[in-house]
Amino acid sequence: MTDIKSMNMEELKELMTQIGEKPFRAKQIYGWLHEHLVTSYDEMANIPKSLKEKLKEYPITVLEELDVQTSKVDGTRKYLFRLSDGNMIESVLMRYKYGNSVCISSQAGCRMGCRFCASTIGGLTRNLLPSEMLDQIYRIQTSIGERISNVVVMGTGEPLDNYDNLLRFIHILTEDGGIHISQRNLTVSTCGLVPRIYELADEKLQMTLAVSLHAPNDEKRRELMPIANKYSVDELLEACRYYFAKTGRRITFEYSLVAGVNDSKENAQELAGRLKGLNCHVNLIPVNPVRERSFVRSTRQAVENFKINLEKCGINGTIRREMGSDIDGACGQLRKRYMEKTESEK
């Protein structure tokens, strides 16, 4: 089945030709889908009825909103969406002074197996289509009636494990004729799929790459992240240097602090030594407690001390502001609770 919302402009023009229509109709349809964010062909005011009838063979991907939780602390909203095949995914709206940011999922489930992450419990179900990634943003923008200015691909899934669909999503999201979010306002995370980082670098996109590092050496990283058994910290950092050389974009390293595991002064100093000379920034995250995992988050003081020790060694660090902590804010938790509830009611 042709997924019309995942098609770029040239592909839409080809489709118009195939069904006996003028190519200019592609621009109109593209605008309705990606700028006006309509959910049906009937809403496309300047499209003739005869073309609308033809287009009914190509269903528009529209996510079904199952649940929305709103934080009483900071207004963060967590959305649970159902896909057309019944799978569920999560997205998060975060409100900042500079605008509205949405964190989206790139897969239903995840196969990376990071020990502290809820979204990988149960493994990978499937990759999301570009249209399913886009529609998370479109549904939320429509829901709040305000423009989404920033997008973070840091929800459930490993984005670079869904590489081709991710690239298509990025181009539709950032190019003219649609919602047109600047590449500089886009962040894509990865747990460290080294070959894909090189490929992404060669695309020379102007987005931010956020690398989940979480440890200063291979031994500790293997305790937390199975991917570390495949690619060493040295290999990962070399790929990051290549990414910066190709794009000029500073790397962000995500570092989740786990009490007694990776939060000591020595860990900070070792991390700083590894990152020396690399144009980067470290985002420190007290690990989110997950019911099925035994990890304990570092104390506030331990997090502050880690930041101070990094900066003493010349590495910039910030402590991530916690958003939506009262609404199952960590990746995968809302989806998992909903699935458990559904199972218990059967």
Summary of predicted features, one role per range:
Residues N87, K97, C191-P195:
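Short beta->alpha connector loops
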Residues Q141-N150, G155-G317:
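Conserved AdoMet/S-adenosylmethionine-binding subsite of the radical SAM
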